């Protein structure tokens, strides 16, 4: 029943809702977490109010992982339901245009504005930094490699529960610092493939789990795991010797994995509970917001850094109000810049 309904529409309504929601949470999160380094260093002693700190932790648990999952989810939909098939090199070029070229264009601007220093500049460091993704753009080269891996999985029909479990295990293994997006690849490949896998099991999931009982269960588990990760495990990490290492690399990483999975499933099932109802259709502004997500992601860190680091904004506004007002300014300006960029052909090629 669900599959038939989905084939009759071109948009994935759940994606049209989840994508702008997650980007909004991402901007909100950064509006809180970047304050301490804001105002040109004049507010390095700024401390988040305890309630705000918990808000950050609840958002932080699954927001960027959800973006990765949605990428694999849409790829799987296009492959399995729309029958889209790409040869390898045309697919690589498509993702270069979509991810790598915007990373380079905006990365150069970010480097010049916020990283460049005549005293420490070297061509080698510039190239490595640029190709690894300047600032928040690190997500783009990492996602590029995830797409290459997912193409191979799809092409050679490797989709299975065992692969999902294997990638989950790999995602919790510490990785060394590597350039070009490879450091975070093992962690995020699990979520991209998780989205791919989720689409293939979507009908089964809806048949067995699309109820408020499961939704509440996932949200409850997520809240518990957030509290464990931020209230209990920090004390365990202070232990020395073997027990401390187990807490740090075993329990800590496993808890974060379970926390992200529960948060993603809670959000996904909550949204799908509404989007699968007969006659549901997102408002036009929701679809428009989904189309603007890429631009908001790219621009928000530019606006945030300028606002927090190069103006006295943080010093002049009451601490209770700073993150909320900062969020409103950052989101508004990012949307405006996205709208202006999409008016040009070049802009549409970059973030359209």
Task: Walk through the language-model features, giving the residues of each.
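Functional transmembrane helices that form membrane-embedded active or gating regions
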Residues: 8-23, 92-93, 97-100, 208-222, ...
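Juxtamembrane "helix-exit" motif on the non-cytosolic side of transmembrane helices
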Residues: 115-120, 173-178, 227-241, 309-314
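Hydrophobic alpha-helical segments of polytopic membrane proteins
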Residues: 156-166, 197-223
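Membrane-cytosol interface segments of multi-pass membrane proteins
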Residues: 1-168, 314-352
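Alpha-helical transmembrane segments and terminal signal-anchor/GPI-anchor hydrophobic tails
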Residues: 207-287
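Aromatic-anchored segments of alpha-helical transmembrane domains
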Residues: 24-31, 108, 165-179, 218-232, ...
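Membrane-interface helix caps and helix-loop-helix hairpins in membrane proteins
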Residues: 129-133, 173-184
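Specific transmembrane alpha-helix
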Residues: 64-77, 141-151, 180-208, 256-277, ...
